[in-house]
Amino acid sequence: KCVVLAREMTLSQIEAMAQALDGEIELESFIHGAVCMSYSGRCMLSSFLTGRSANRGGCAQSCRWKFGLTEEKRPGQVFPIEEDASGTYILSSRDLNAMPLLDEILAAGVTSLKIEGRMKTAYYVATVVNAYRMRLNGADEGLCMEELSAVSHRPYTTGFYRDEAKRAPNAPEGYERTREYLAPVVGRDGDRIVCEVKNKLQEGREVELLHPGRAPVRFVARDLRGEDGAPVSAAAEPGRRFTMPAPGEAGAGDYLRADI
């Protein structure tokens, strides 16, 4: 048996619950990803605007759309509430990142860690899961935190674990990331990896290879070849495949990315 904990529970509350249950029921806690702006996720915004119920796993994250305020006698005149160069985000929560508290969460009695995957790319899930797996295996926290900055995310918060969400709940800054996702590795052909273009890769660019359970490996992309085996200076057409030499045991399930 397993109980999925509400995201507004603090570390002290989780510890008290674990002690009361005395190991009879496992505890699962959400540790990374988008956080609902409504208490306990009881939000009807997505259901009202899109017909997709947040309470049935179908949230369209409508709270992250751009909103403005209008007065009924001034139709068409929009009043910004909290605006920057990217728009107004009055309902947007920061993203949860519990990496700094991971040891404390486990010590409190949590036995299952939940990471957001719905509405995210395979690259996002692979990067985040790999970062937490490395940390659980003893990797340096700084390295793992750097990995979490690589994916597209809103400014991070540790949420309600230490009540930080009450002090800085919103993220008007928008999304940020430090890496560009280039291609998934879909196979291997001798000493070359077979990749599928997601974003343009120019020959000579320094790239990183993301491999499960390991820190990323940097190398320079050289000797790119298209689907017909002919040399190309760049892999640029989304969906097309290309090959190139790669270090180590790179293969299907790995990802290529580069600094922005």
PLM segments and residue spans:
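Conserved thiamine diphosphate
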Residues: K1
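Active-site pocket-lining/capping segments in soluble small-molecule metabolic enzymes
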Residues: V4-L5, L11-S112, M119-I260
